[in-house]
Amino acid sequence: KAIDDAVRRVTEATGLPPVMVCHSMGGLAARAWLRAYAADARVHRVLTLGTPHAGTWLARFSHTENGRQMRMNSAWLQALKAQEPPGRAKLFVCWYSNCDNIVFPATVAVLPGAQHRLVTGVVHVQMVLGPLVVQACLRELEAPVPELPALTR
């Protein structure tokens, strides 16, 4: 509900669908929101920074609900993937790092069908603050909306 309200407020204020910039589990929250609201047409693009799209090795030590959801091959992640329509990943640009100390191995931070951007030598939290990623995210504001299947637009 919070994501839906925020997207609605930005759209009302600007007249445009927003670019969502999501760090870590925020990218999973965006995917869950897109699933729950069938909201593909309501966003311009979704940029994920170090999101554990396929889980993360470190989550095996978590005992919280969110931590269990981020375990590699968790039932929650499998259900999320299974319930996403074909072509949704085209909305996504996924930044990932070979030095992410939270989301690893690096391959878990990519979403099949999305655009992928490798950032070398950057740890998990730096992905949000590093000038390279910030500037690249700003450039995405000008990128054309990807063509999606008519069913999801």
Predicted feature residues:
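Serine-dependent carboxylesterase/thioesterase catalytic core
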Residues: 1-88, 95, 102
